[in-house]
């Protein structure tokens, strides 16, 4: 569902809060640059999407002129809702790297 920039930020906040209160599920965020069509004279824009499984998909198109202001608000929303993130366990990957490098040089 394509929303205005303000509506997108409100819906994204609601979506992240819903998942945080449930304690399960994932929200995927993506960005894609839209190329400039020289024939139409339009400016460059960025498509930003948020997806919560198959249940809810929201998106907005941000014009390059408003991108800095929008991205500051977008970052605040995301940072405010990342409380539930788990720190990645890197111990396993470090052990695997040591095994491959030490066994490779005999």
Swiss-Prot record:
It comes from the Eukaryota. It holds the Pfam family SRP14. Transmembrane segments: none annotated. The keyword Lipid biosynthesis does not apply. GO terms for molecular function: 7S RNA binding; endoplasmic reticulum signal peptide binding. Keywords: Cytoplasm, Ribonucleoprotein, RNA-binding, Signal recognition particle. GO terms for cellular component: nucleolus; nucleus; signal recognition particle, endoplasmic reticulum targeting. One of its GO terms (biological process) is intracellular protein transport. It is found in: Cytoplasm. InterPro entries: Signal_recog_particle_SRP14, Signal_recog_particle_SRP9/14. Residues 86-100 have a biased composition (Basic residues). Residues 86-106 are annotated as: Disordered. Its main location: cytoplasm. PANTHER family: SIGNAL RECOGNITION PARTICLE 14 KD PROTEIN. Component of the signal recognition particle (SRP) complex, a ribonucleoprotein complex that mediates the cotranslational targeting of secretory and membrane proteins to the endoplasmic reticulum (ER). Component of a fungal signal recognition particle (SRP) complex that consists of a 7SL RNA molecule (scR1) and at least six protein subunits: srp72, srp68, srp54, sec65, srp21 and srp14. Belongs to the SRP14 family. This is Signal recognition particle subunit srp14. It comes from Schizosaccharomyces pombe (strain 972 / ATCC 24843) (Fission yeast). The gene is srp14.
């Amino acid at each position: 569902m394509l929303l205005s920039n303000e509506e997108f930020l409100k819906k994204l906040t609601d979506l992240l809060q819903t998942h945080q209160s449930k304690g399960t599920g994932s929200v995927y965020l993506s960005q894609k640059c839209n190329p400039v069509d020289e024939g139409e004279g339009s400016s460059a824009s960025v498509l930003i999407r948020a997806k919560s499984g198959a249940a809810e998909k929201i998106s907005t198109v941000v014009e390059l002129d408003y991108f800095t202001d929008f991205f500051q608000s977008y970052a605040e929303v995301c940072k405010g809702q990342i409380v539930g993130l788990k720190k990645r366990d890197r111990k396993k990957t470090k052990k695997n790297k040591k095994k491959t490098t030490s066994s490779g040089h005999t």
